[in-house]
Amino acid sequence: MSMPIVREVNSDGSMLQPFSNPLWVPTPVGRSGRKHRTLKMCIVLPDTGYDVTQVCDPWQFFVKEGFMVNFATLTGIVAQADQRLLSGVKSWFIGATYKTKDIYERMSTTKEFLSPSNMSDMSFTFENFDLVYVPGGQDPAVLELVESPRLSSLLADYIPLCARVSGTRVLATMAQGAIAVQRAAPNLEIKSTTTPLYMERASYLFGASNPPAYTYTYIPESKYVPGPKTAHWVYSDEKFFYASGRYSGDVELLCKALRNLVASALH
């Protein structure tokens, strides 16, 4: 079977425009044959150092798609962004765009963001969500998150619900987020892409932190899909409703791929 690949298509970008109506609320999206309801998404965040682009752009995309987007951290505290991406000299090279910064200002004032779920609470589960997204980031706290036993346990329960043969849930990762999936499912045939060596080296030249090891080395070779050397590309797994991206430049394409996966899972 050939590897399913999602490639970039033309778009007017309207999904990423700022809200024009301050009273806008999510539109219920229903499962086929069932009463309409609002779909729920969970964005998993480190306590500090999350990547602004990898978090804010998907948040706006899926809120505009009609999802109720919630957040979760390991301790239940409000997550703090990687400030290098918002201000300072390094932000000129590796920082977020002005559009993303505008989204950040809006997202960081929402009730959902200011009241994240506590993943350490043993009653917390991902099973209540239709879509779970684990973004990455260059801050050391991101690596602590994706390697945490608690996140591994939560994902181990959730991933089987994403099986294409019988599942109705969707999973997504970006960059370092893929490490969490592979740690949670070492015995499952689930594959990921993540930041390739050449991209990671380039980011360090422009001021990103130097990690203890390159991200792709955390993923078993048999489960790692490097992908082509194109600007925008994401990988969609063959056996699970799971899509992964390599770096912040893949965010918009990942969102589009996830929209398609959610539609497939609901049917």
From Swiss-Prot:
InterPro entries per UniProt: Class_I_gatase-like (IPR029062), ThiJ-like (IPR032633)
Family: To S.pombe SpAC18G6.12c.
SUPFAM superfamilies to which the protein is assigned, alphabetical: Class I glutamine amidotransferase-like (SSF52317)
GO molecular function: catalytic activity
Name of this protein: Uncharacterized protein C14C4.04
GO CC terms in record: fungal-type vacuole membrane; Golgi apparatus
Gene3D superfamilies: 3.40.50.880
